[in-house]
Amino acid sequence: DGPGPALRLTGTHLGTASPKTFKPKTWNERMPIVAGIEILGAHPEADGIALIRTMGAIVDDVSVRWCRHGIHLIERNRNTVIADCHLYENSGIGVYLDDLSLHQINVSNSHISYNRQGGIVVRDGNVRNLQITGCDIEANMPHDETPTKTANILIDVSGSPEDKTKSIAEVAITGNTIQHSANYSGTEDKTVAPGGANIRLAGKEIYDIDSVTISGNVLSDTTTSIDIDRAHDVAISANNFFAPKPRNLRVTNSQRVVVSGNTFNPRQFERPGTIYFENCDDCIVSNSTIHKFDTDEGALVLAGCSGFVLNGLTFTDCGPGIILRETKDTTISSCRISRTSEGAQDIAIDDSNSNILLNGNAFSGEVLIEKSALASSPDQ
């Protein structure tokens, strides 16, 4: 009924995950287990469980409702497992990695929903080896028209722009359903939680977020499904995107992002769905289907980019198809664009671009291709 966590587990581990860093008393504290309980909050600052300096903590078969934060990890932890939990309808964050040192954490087989400040949030700290798999993660943002920067999964070091000690890398987000809220079944003119995302990576200029895999997820119904700023070496593969409002994917100020083998489809809705890259280098978008993007912006937009490969993409029933602006050293090959909206262009490459190589593409509608933007090649 009061502020703070219902359960606070405080250990003494100050080392890493290496056995050489353990003190004898740490082994006596190892693997604290919280299992088979329900926690209900009755205070605005009531939390569920806090983990501090633990080694091998396991939270399993636990329900947390009506609290502020569900599971709050603080200061330093190692080898944490959160599994088979229900973190539901909390005013804060479901699983909160709060500016801590944490390597090795698994979050799996859990329902994390309706937590209004984010589902799984990693903010600052030094975090490595985060695995999120087999979860249903939904509507972890405001439930009304309040603007937000949170996400169902938020990984954010942008709040410490001058501090290189705070960094996040080595993340796997696999096999989850991640969705809501934007406007799944509401009126077209209303957007719930504008600015929200399913997955948001927010890095910083002095230290990008890096080495992230996003694979095998079902993603839908947020302002931007995946939003990436200042990251490198990110693999986005074999995901199903639908019902965005307005964007499926936005990537800015990033390098070596690979987007491959995905399906992009609004399903029964009319949605824009744009895939947008700005100020990015050496990325690949390939082997994906892009269907019925109802937008004048362009289905796939590159703005101020360099060194891209677009290959094996199928666009059907979209507004404008591929749009390039101030982009250079880019190859577009084996792409097929058909049934583009009347008056829209399959591809637009104006004279702000340079050294663009086209090879083996099939365009069935209008095209705008300035010869001065093209690379010198016999295939042009």
What is the predicted function of each stretch?
Residues 1-33, 40-56, 73, 157-162, ...:
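Extracellular beta-strand-rich solenoid/capping regions of secreted or surface-exposed proteins
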Residues 333-380:
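Leucine-rich solenoid repeat scaffolds
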Residues 2-6, 43-49, 68-74, 91-97, ...:
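Short glycine/acidic-rich loop motifs that flank beta-strands on beta-rich extracellular proteins
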Residues 23-115, 144:
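Right-handed parallel beta-helix
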Residues 37, 62, 85, 90, ...:
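Consensus "Asn ladder" position of solenoid repeat domains
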